[in-house]
Amino acid sequence: MKNNEKVFLLIDTSGSMIENEKRSILKYVYRPFKTIIGDRLLAYSWGDEIKEVSKVSELRMQGKINNETTEKFLNNLEENSHLVIMSDGSFETDIFKKLEKKVNMYFVGIGSDVDKKILEYTFGKNNYFEAYDILNLANWLKREIS
């Protein structure tokens, strides 16, 4: 793997993330993830638009996922990029299935209402992680990009 590889992180900021303390869970799993990956992590808010964020604590949860914006973002990723999605899974999974190039995608389920079966089907059983498993994913990615 290249020494300059980045890990792209999409953080779901849609309105469904307001429910059931998901924002608190998100902050809890983000900190160790950021610490392990370091400056190779590029975090983006993912909702009506996708934009890079520097402080996860300032994210506002509102609106809904914009499929067109998501598709453009995904198509701009380089082949074999590492993409981590932190979400409750309330979005259309077909966008990710349509991706023409190979992108290594991992999903971190946030909240108790995550539909694990659909997400495992979409991203692969080995690419789905519960929030409590974030350290395993982060350490594995660190080895992949080093």
Language-model features: where?
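Short, Lys/Arg-enriched, disordered terminal segments
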Residues: 1-4, 143-146
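A short, well-structured beta->alpha microelement
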Residues: 62-75
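Solvent-exposed polar/charged
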Residues: 35, 76, 121-122
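Von Willebrand factor
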Residues: 2-55, 70, 79-86
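VWA/integrin I-like adhesion module and closely mimicked acidic/polar interface patches used
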Residues: 21, 57-65, 89-144
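Short, surface-exposed, polar/charged, turn-prone segments marking secondary-structure boundaries
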Residues: 35-39, 70-73, 110-113, 133-136
